[in-house]
């Protein structure tokens, strides 16, 4: 009876939501999105344009007499990012084996999965501050990168395992009786190209993330950009390290693109006798490049491990922190002030996330559409290069430049994160659009259909599952970024975490952070439940 109230039958085993319920949902979603826009976008600051122009002028008038020590900071960055990313990736592979529902029994995978969800719920701000207070800069940076890489690679690699065809794994597991051996031979070795791609994308993201790490006082070349933009803003000290950082990031992007396109990408090989020599030669070069890649990776990781100072600065600090962290202050929750009550802070954070994610989805589709193969190659490549340059510009620099233009910092943060996430997810949407059936697209073109018509009636329909996945991933990501930018006014809750930690008010810190963690855990469990339903884990793998 309840089913008939909401759905109507369109086939033997297929039901569809009744149109007026669908319309009601659309109206409700639009109302929430519009409210979030109104609540989070402030007016343009009419006096800020001159400040913005002066900041741009100062940025492009570098101080040539300042000593920057670029080589040392760049080498330090390469060491701790590579070493931390590699260490986190190794642990992610192991944990993904134990958390994949299609590989492990449900009673094993679920508890370990929940542990990783809880660990991921700790704000990056919190661990960044903890590590930077306990260890020296290089060790703190390595641990933060490792922690971040481990938790997020575990999530994505586990999803990859659960979406894979594991027939050969189960057959080998039954024959040999060893689950890990079967996993190693049928999944890890056969899919190692795809797994290395996860590492490359993680490595690239971590290099771009180094400037944000410097907020915690962690070293690296990002520190040369963050320090002049902190208390006493000095744009004239930013350009030279910025050019070096952007050049280095573009080099990393090019290396990742070449490795992912020619070394780690699975391509079908033409084994005709006439081309056999070419195929063998190609395999040989791929093997040589792969060996060189591994040698460089291990060398940088070992260099990082050797040069780290492993001393702990203040062991008692950690004990004091956790003794106070779980002593929640009930008076904060009874306040009606959204700047004090943690629950009201979460409501505000949610409206910020909704306003941002709605724009990210729109601009991701737009950017992906403009840079896909529907347009002339020269135009799409030019736009991809533009997105690349936008993506590698540090977010903190964009914030300092754009902030005078608006009356409230929260508007600036949303625009900065929109630029960052829109360009990143736009690249992903472009890849998905380019996988569409070219024959169908040509058929639309032959019938005189416009590019906009093809986007709306074919590309978006075909990529609906990808768009849903991107939206869920982006929602989780933008919430964490809003928290991270709290020290710049990005979110009340992020600002409170920063202030309470700096003042050593760890009981107040716990009162704000624990509800936030529960909120993040709830969101991830909801997304996980949707995914479990899609892979039918309860039906096929509950044993």
Curated annotation (Swiss-Prot):
InterPro entries registered for this protein in UniProt: MetI-like, MetI-like_sf
Record has Transferase as a keyword: no
Membrane topology, as annotated: Multi-pass membrane protein
One cellular component (GO) term of this entry: plasma membrane
Principal localisation: membrane
Signal peptide: none
Domain ABC transmembrane type-1: 74-256
GO-annotated biological processes: transmembrane transport
Localization in the cell: Cell membrane
UniProtKB keywords: Cell membrane, Membrane, Repeat, Transmembrane, Transmembrane helix, Transport
Superkingdom field: Bacteria
Transmembrane stretches, start-end: 18-38, 78-98, 115-135, 141-161, 211-231, 237-257, 288-308, 354-374, 379-399, 413-433, 482-502, 510-530
Record flagged with keyword Lipid metabolism: no
Domain commentary: Composed of two homologous domains.
Family: Belongs to the binding-protein-dependent transport system permease family.
PANTHER family (UniProt xref): ABC TRANSPORT SYSTEM PERMEASE PROTEIN P69, PHOSPHONATES TRANSPORT SYSTEM PERMEASE PROTEIN
Function: Probably part of a high-affinity transport system.
Name recorded for this polypeptide: ABC transport system permease protein p69
Gene: p69
